[in-house]
């Protein structure tokens, strides 16, 4: 019986439509961050659930990586070292650019924390080096130059890249070896952990991961290392699970626009609360979106095709811009926030 070889990576068709959806998610995150400048609380965001786009990124990442690489491990065409080198080349150049821009923005703002406390030049150098090496800042130390207990105070969204690297390492060492049964168990356990952290952080949502804490809710109520780990484990894992036995169905026409509308609807939904206060109903909404709706959007997109030049061009351009725009936009947001708050603009 002849041996069936997995075709080389370049032979697999590229999911241009999913690239386009990644770009839509990046734009949603930018709008979410823009609206934070005028927000008075969790209930008054311009894009109340914009942070769910990051969950979408993690799910999409798991799906695309599983689609592109799972077969190559089985046939010895991929090693952990080669895989991580590919991820490093793909991700890290823009991380370097973003953290340098973040340091420049911080210097332009006068090297002060949010409360006006001046920070010495060496603290900026330390934060810059840690950011380049993707080492999270220890809260309330010289590394925490903005004083928000962020993992990466010079470029806040870099927390998601930190967890993306963790997911990639875990995939290279363990997850690609898991049978579908064990991968399903991994996803279920991660989902239980994610739900527990979501209801335990008392924010009515689970914007977890950007803050550095021990248990997930002991330093800032909506952050946490543990919450972030469950966050990426479930999302990345369910993305991988979607690829197991995946056989694209007949192309769903208009699926890019359908999926874009669904993703926008999920993220633009108002904060869910019966009395105007922080509510666990909103946390339940977040979990339902991540457990069911966002994976469904990825599945629909993976089964879809672009059938006209305009849609194809939109997807290609959004895909090319998605990661660079996502990872470098926040240094400009720091300057924008400073301008808005200094001039009391509402």
Q: What positions do the PLM features span?
A:
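Alpha-helical transmembrane segments in multi-pass integral membrane proteins
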Residues: 2-17, 27-50, 66-78, 139-149, ...
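Alpha-helical transmembrane segments and their helix-entry boundary regions
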Residues: 18, 83, 91-94, 160, ...
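Hydrophobic alpha-helical transmembrane bundles that constitute the permease/transmembrane domains
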Residues: 20-23, 49, 161-165, 229
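Small-polar-interrupted transmembrane alpha-helices in polytopic inner-membrane proteins
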Residues: 21-33, 182-202, 258-267
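Active-site His/Glu-centered metal-binding helix of metallohydrolases
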Residues: 24, 35, 57, 162, ...
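Transmembrane alpha-helical segments and their boundary/interface "anchor" motifs
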Residues: 51-54, 71-112, 117-134, 167-168, ...
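Membrane-interface helix-loop-helix regions
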Residues: 91-165, 193-222, 289-302
């Amino acid at each position: 019986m002849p041996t069936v070889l997995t075709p080389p990576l370049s032979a697999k068709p590229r999911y241009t439509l999913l690239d386009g959806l990644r770009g839509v998610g990046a734009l949603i995150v930018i709008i979410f961050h823009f609206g934070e400048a005028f927000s008075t609380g969790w209930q008054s965001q311009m894009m109340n659930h914009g942070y769910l786009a990051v969950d979408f990124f993690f799910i999409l990442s798991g799906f695309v990586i599983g689609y592109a690489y799972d077969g190559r491990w089985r046939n010895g065409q991929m090693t952990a070292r080669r895989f991580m080198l590919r991820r490093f080349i793909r991700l890290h150049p823009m991380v370097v650019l973003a953290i340098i821009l973040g340091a420049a923005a911080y210097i332009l703002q006068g090297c002060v924390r949010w409360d006006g406390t001046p920070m010495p030049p060496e603290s900026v150098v330390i934060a810059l080096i840690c950011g380049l090496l993707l080492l999270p800042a220890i809260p309330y130390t010289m590394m925490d130059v903005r004083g928000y207990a962020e993992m990466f105070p010079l470029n806040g969204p870099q927390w998601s890249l930190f967890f993306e690297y963790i997911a990639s390492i875990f995939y290279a060492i363990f997850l690609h070896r898991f049978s579908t049964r064990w991968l399903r168990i991994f996803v279920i356990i991660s989902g239980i952990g994610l739900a527990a952290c979501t209801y335990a952080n008392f924010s009515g949502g689970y914007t977890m991961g950007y803050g550095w804490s021990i248990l997930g809710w002991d330093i800032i109520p909506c952050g946490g290392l543990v919450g972030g780990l469950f966050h990426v484990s479930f999302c990345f894992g369910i993305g991988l699970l979607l690829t197991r036995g995946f056989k694209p169905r007949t192309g769903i026409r208009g699926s890019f626009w359908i999926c874009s509308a669904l993703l926008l609807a999920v993220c633009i939904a108002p904060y869910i609360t019966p009395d105007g206060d922080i509510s666990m109903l909103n946390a339940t909404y977040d979990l339902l979106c991540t457990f069911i709706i966002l994976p469904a959007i990825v599945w629909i997109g993976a089964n879809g095709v672009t059938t006209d030049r305009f849609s194809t061009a939109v997807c290609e351009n959004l895909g090319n811009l998605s990661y660079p725009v996502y990872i470098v936009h926040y240094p400009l947001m720091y300057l924008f926030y400073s301008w808005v708050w200094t001039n009391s603009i509402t």
